[in-house]
Every structure is written in C-alpha cells, then in structure tokens.
Amino acid sequence: MDFPSRFEVIVIGGGHAGTEAALASARMGAKTLLLTHNVETLGAMSCNPAIGGIGKSHLVKEIDALGGAMAMATDKGGIQFRVLNSRKGPAVRATRAQADRILYKAAVREILENQPNLWIFQQAADDLIVEQDQVRGVVTQMGLRFFAESVVLTTGTFLGGLIHIGMQNYSGGRAGDPPSIALAQRLRELPLRVGRLKTGTPPRIDGRSVDFSVMTEQPGDTPIPVMSFLGSKEQHPPQVSCWITHTNARTHEIIASNLDRSPMYSGVIEGIGPRYCPSIEDKIHRFADKESHQVFIEPEGLTTHELYPNGISTSLPFDVQLQIVQSIRGMENAHIVRPGYAIEYDYFDPRDLKYSLETKVIGGLFFAGQINGTTGYEEAGAQGLLAGANAALRAQGKDSWCPRRDEAYIGVLVDDLITLGTQEPYRMFTSRAEYRLILREDNADLRLTEKGRELGLVDDVRWAAFCKKREGIAQEEQRLKSTWVRPGTEQGDAIAQKFGTPLTHEYNLLNLLSRPEIDYAGLVEVTGQGAEDPQVAEQVEIKTKYAGYIDRQQDEIARLRASEDTKLPVDIDYSGISGLSKEIQSKLGATRPETLGQASRIPGVTPAAISLLMIHLKKRGAGRQLEQSA
C-alpha cells in the first residue's frame, strides 16, 4: 500500500549520518521521514564509545556550527574529555570525548523526537522507486511505499553485511542486527561503481575481571572541555578515567602462530580494511619489529562494567581472542562479554557523486556515510548533515551547497571523496587540509554559522549566542587596540616584570599580545580587565598571535579562488579537446569534475592540461556568444 502522507525528504538509516541528515532536512523546513530498521538503535555507537580526536573533532565542531546534534549529544553523554595536541598550535588541537553509549544514544533520540517536521518510522527499506532516472520514493520490507522528492541513503555497514569471526561468517549489519540484502541487490542494479570494504571491532571485556592496579591511569582534563559551542560542563555526567596497557611478546606470538586462522590472511575477506585503525593481527604482521602496542582500556558507560580495549580489533577465532586478551598485562583473568569481529559490506565509488552528495546518475538520490567509503562517526555525521541539507534544498527547488576546501573540513572531506575516490575506508586528518590554520576547531562557528543561518540550519538560540560571541570578539579587539601602556608607568613596569620584556616605547595591548612571550591571561592579570567569555578570549588571542600566517593563507586562497569557482559544463567532451592525452581524457571522463579546481586535484591531471581546459572554456564561451549574436 501507499503511505497516506507524502514527504519531501526520506532518510534511510538511523546511525550518525542518518540522524544528522534527517535533522538537517527537518530544520530547513522540509517534511522529513527517517526510516530505521529499529527505533531502539537510533544514534547507536556501533564501534568505539568515543567522539572526536585529531581531525575528527574539527568535523564535530563544524556539524555543531551548522546546528547538528553530535556535539550536543556528546556533552550530555561524555564521561571523559581531553584536548589532544594541547601543547601544539591551535590548528591541530583536537577535543576528544569518551562517551557513555546509553546516555549518548538517549541524547540523540531526544533531539530527534523533539525536532519539528521530522517523522520516524520503523521498517527496513528494501527497494527504491525510480522513474526516468529520478528517485520517487522507497518501498519497505512489508511493501509499504513512501514517496518523496529526495532520498538519502545512510546504510552504514548494513549493505550486504557479512560478519567474520575466524573461519565462520554469517550475514549481519552489525552484531545482533540483520543486514540489508534486498536493498543492496537493488543498488547493484543501478549504473554505479560498487566495491567491498571491511572494518572491525575488538572483544568487549568485563571490568570486574580486570586488574587496573598494573595499568597506567589516564584521567580527563581539568578544567573539563566542552564539545558544543553551546555546551557547558554542567551538562556533563560524572567523569571517569581510561587506562593504558600494552601487548607483549607473548601476545604477538599467539597472533603470529594463528594467522592461518584469520579470515583476513586466508583470503576469506575480500574487502580492504581501514589503514589508520588496523586490526591487531594486521599490526603484528605489518609492524613485526615492534615489541608492543598500546591498548587503551575505555569504559563503555557509567551503568555497565563493559570495557572497550581500543587497539586490539580482531576477527581471529574466539579461542585465539581469549588467549590474546589474557596475555595482556592486567587482563590475565579477563572475561570476554562479546567477541570481536570483522564486517564486510558494500560501498559505492564516491566519484559517482556531485558535491551535494547527490548521485550523478539518479536525480534526488543522495549517499552519506560508510556507503561512500568513509570510516568514523564524525565523517558520517558531517556527510549526513550535508546530504540532508542538499536533499531539502533540492526538494524546495533551490541550489545545492557545499563548503569549499578553504571553508571547512567538511569541504575537504567531500572534495577528496568525489575527486579522488577511495579504495580503503577514508579517515579525516588535519594533514588532509591545505589551510589548517584557518580551519581550526575553535573557529568552526565563525566560519560556518552565518551560512547555516542563511540555509535555515541554525535556530534562534544558537544564532543569538553566535552573534553575542562575534560582537564580544570585535569589542575586545577594539578595547585592546585602544588601550595604551607606556614605559615607566605602573602598568608598563608590571608588564615588564610579568613577562620579562621591558617596554621601549608606547604600545597598545593588541600589539603586545602579538608577541610570543605574552599571553592573554597574563595581560588580563596585569591590567585587571578582560573578556568574561573564554571563547571570546581564545579567539582574540589566536587571531592576534597568528595574524600574519592567517593573512598569507587568505591571500593564497584569494589567488586560487578564480579557478576553484570556474564551472565545467556537464556535457563537456574531453575526447574532443586538442592536446589532452588519452590518459588525462580518461581520468577527467571518469571523475566528471564540476569545477576547474576539482579537475586540478585529480591525480595525473597536469597544470598543462588545466591550461588546455581553460583555453577550451574560453573558446566555447566565445563561440556561444557568436551564436547568440547571430
């Protein structure tokens, strides 16, 4: 039967990509349906109980700046917060939170259920309704038909999911959940390039069977950081420590002697696993010279004894898993609550997507998350928000939007995926961005919230808080610029004594703050006045100290902007462009870049080829002008 009500956007999947997609679409006023096979697993953390980290927290903060849920749910569910790289520059500092799975999931569900324009329905999606290369809706497992202008697929590891533990395998989307077989078969019928990837998870341990006294304690930071720009430490539940132990020679011997029983090394698993989150057997094989590897013992929540041993993801047989765990210091008597496993699943080549994350071959069909070859909650959430927003824009007859590489890590992520594709699960790092000093986690709101407001993603509460912060920064910069200190005065002498820097002439406080040896907190201590909001103080200090570097990056961005924004015609025939080699014609034809800037980032496309493209575009433009004037 047909569902009696029509929607503008349908989102399939209730994981990190799906929830952000559905929320984004609904915030923009589109009537949105979130289809999930199980309402109880909305926002579930399928793998590690943590949000953020190097490169990843930048995505979380950008999701937050655009009104998303991930950071707010983390503040409500985070049981340990730390700032990584705190001794390094602001470009690479990253907030990481250990989360209580139950609290995090509950926070996500609360946000979903209180979002206007959003309906939730529990049914697996088995088929897409496609007419004349346009998606029209979805057919569920029981034959119920839903219709909409846009459909967002966020299927995670469920498409053709196959779980491996040793030589045994069985179909599953994740442990305890069925796979999506019918939808996977339907998608394989579409003219899209498909492949297989693999990810894995470690065995879970009962904390009552672990000896923490021989491990190294890793407490959270004090003062406790927050993840959301609207967050506060008062939202946080009680905080706990993580613990560190190590594998050893005995552990490595057990693994090495059982590699023939590993589905990875016996050819059973075809999918490629994540390079930057390898299984323990992969680590032992690839880094045979290392005597030990760190294992982070992470609590799964405040109301459970379950522990997540981060660093020993494995698909070895259970008897080997038990030997591995019990060979590690502090876990000699450990009880495994859930075995580790690997899961293999379908993904689709992201080069078949537009910047909006809409497929090039089926209008109105959007992909987000692991279906695009990424790994990680944060990468999924970022894509989900973008796909959901663009699905709503399409349904409303408006132009799509995607931030550029110099505007957001979301822009870096999408550009990498649709330009380069990926043959292994893609993870975000700060090193992937050319303009790291501009794309910091601390200024994500200053970069994106105004655009989010324009799109309809940002509500009144967030907008008011943002405007207050932005105004506070401007006022504090002006105060520092207009406050002067002279040598020989009480303040001048106090500054010289505090920082060991005698004043040679009159300075304003903004000039002084630009010196490497002078910090904002110290200036406030000496002068007795400063910003009350720590976010304002942080922005003023970073902007002042790194002004020269930031200006240089902005100049470089401005120079490149022209080619970045030059659109390539959808119908361009690369085989007809004189001077392009067959190889470059093939690469351009396979990727179908949307802009000249994107074309320049395709491996093997030379600067000379870009020049030829520019000449072709000029000739094409001149030719069309002549046709119009004739």
UniProtKB/Swiss-Prot annotation:
GO cellular component: cytosol
Keywords on record: Cytoplasm, FAD, Flavoprotein, NAD, tRNA processing
Keyword tRNA processing listed: yes
Subcellular location field: Cytoplasm
Gene3D superfamilies: FAD/NAD(P)-binding domain, GidA associated domain, C-terminal subdomain, tRNA uridine 5-carboxymethylaminomethyl modification enzyme MnmG/GidA
Chief location of this protein within or outside the cell: cytoplasm
Top-rank taxon: Bacteria
Annotated residues for binding of FAD: G13, G14, G15, H16, A17, G18
Assigned protein family: Belongs to the MnmG family.
Gene source species: Pseudomonas fluorescens (strain ATCC BAA-477 / NRRL B-23932 / Pf-5)
GO molecular function annotation: flavin adenine dinucleotide binding
Disulfide bonds: none
Name the UniProt record assigns to this protein: tRNA uridine 5-carboxymethylaminomethyl modification enzyme MnmG
SMART domains on file: GIDA_assoc_3 (SM01228)
Task of the protein: NAD-binding protein involved in the addition of a carboxymethylaminomethyl (cmnm) group at the wobble position (U34) of certain tRNAs, forming tRNA-cmnm(5)s(2)U34.
Quaternary structure and interacting proteins, as annotated: Homodimer. Heterotetramer of two MnmE and two MnmG subunits.
Residues that, per the record, bind NAD(+): 273-287
Cofactor(s) demanded: FAD
GO BP terms in the entry: tRNA methylation; tRNA wobble uridine modification
